[in-house]
Amino acid sequence: MSSGGLLLLLGLLTLWEGLTPVSSKDRPNFCHLPHDPGPCKGNFQAFYYHPVRRTCLEFIYGGCQGNPNNFKTIDECKRTCAA
């Protein structure tokens, strides 16, 4: 392979790495837990990370227990799990 071809390949690999989303290995483990409203009967807007869709979604949190995949704002969810 010519040096020009190697440089092109190296450039493409570098670009691909930069455009690839964050690996699931880089996310906290709790980002992969399903949303859990908990047993209480509150009605609080919350957000959780959906690993298949690779985005944060809204759900209604009951106000107690649940799991750590539970954020008060979508920005907090994105910073923690989708960044």
From Swiss-Prot:
Its main location: secreted. Expressed by the venom gland. Disulfide bonds join 31-81, 40-64, 56-77. InterPro entries: Kunitz_BPTI (IPR002223), Kunitz_BPTI_sf (IPR036880), Prtase_inh_Kunz-CS (IPR020901), TFPI/VKTCI-like (IPR050098). GO terms for molecular function: serine-type endopeptidase inhibitor activity; toxin activity. The keyword rRNA processing does not apply. The record marks 41-42 as: Reactive bond for trypsin. One of its GO terms (cellular component) is extracellular space. PROSITE patterns: BPTI_KUNITZ_1, BPTI_KUNITZ_2. Keywords: Disulfide bond, Protease inhibitor, Secreted, Serine protease inhibitor, Signal, Toxin. CDD domains: Kunitz_textilinin-like. It comes from the Eukaryota. Pfam families: Kunitz_BPTI. It is found in: Secreted. Residues 1-24 form the signal peptide. Residues 31-81 form the BPTI/Kunitz inhibitor domain. Serine protease inhibitor. Belongs to the venom Kunitz-type family. This is Kunitz-type serine protease inhibitor mulgin-5.
